[in-house]
């Protein structure tokens, strides 16, 4: 009888354990962010934007303003960073942490750094809500908070 209770207890514990998505979300999102920075640094807006979910509910929150829709976000980046004659600083990410929430949802926190030559010109923390769509993690929501200027 004691053995039966052990089997039941193990079964209950297994059912209660959170389900992890297949693969390694932390590594996959890390690869996505490195590719995203490389696209940015090459001037490839379409590549950079391919990591955002291409729909009207994709959201971007920065400095108290929420922008909705992939196209609106694309247009913002095009006008502010990728237009002819605009200077675009070199982008890197650090302190990337990813937490799976469900089989196909995760959130990530990290810091962005923008350098112009050897000078840091902007930085700050951000949070991403991501969804696995097919083989790719895509950004549903991006909340970026630039650090105050010194």
Q: Language-model segments: what does each one mean?
A:
Residues 2-13:
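Bacterial N-terminal signal peptides
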Residues 14-51, 150:
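Short, low-complexity N-terminal intrinsically disordered segments enriched in polar/charged residues
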Residues 17-18, 123-150:
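Short beta-strand edge/turn micro-motifs at domain boundaries
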Residues 36, 48-49, 56-58, 69, ...:
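Hydrophobic pocket/interface hotspot
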Residues 52-53, 64, 97, 110-112, ...:
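A mature extracytoplasmic/lumenal domain signature
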Residues 57-68, 82-86:
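A short gly/proline-enriched turn/hairpin at secondary-structure junctions
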Residues 72-120:
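Surface-exposed, charged secondary-structure patches
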């Amino acid at each position: 009888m004691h053995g039966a209770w052990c089997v039941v207890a193990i079964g209950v514990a297994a059912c209660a354990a959170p389900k992890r998505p297949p693969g390694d979300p932390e590594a996959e999102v890390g690869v996505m962010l490195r590719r995203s920075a490389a696209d940015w640094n090459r001037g490839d807006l379409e590549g950079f934007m391919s990591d955002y979910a291409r729909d009207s509910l994709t959201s971007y929150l920065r400095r108290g303003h929420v922008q909705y829709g992939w196209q609106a976000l694309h247009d913002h980046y095009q006008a502010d960073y990728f237009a002819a004659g605009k200077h675009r600083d070199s982008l890197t990410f650090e302190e990337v942490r990813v937490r799976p929430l469900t089989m196909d949802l995760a959130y990530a926190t990290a810091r962005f750094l923008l350098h112009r030559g050897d000078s840091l010109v902007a930085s700050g923390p951000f949070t991403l809500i991501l969804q696995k769509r097919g083989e790719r993690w895509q950004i549903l929501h991006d909340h970026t908070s630039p650090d105050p200027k010194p």
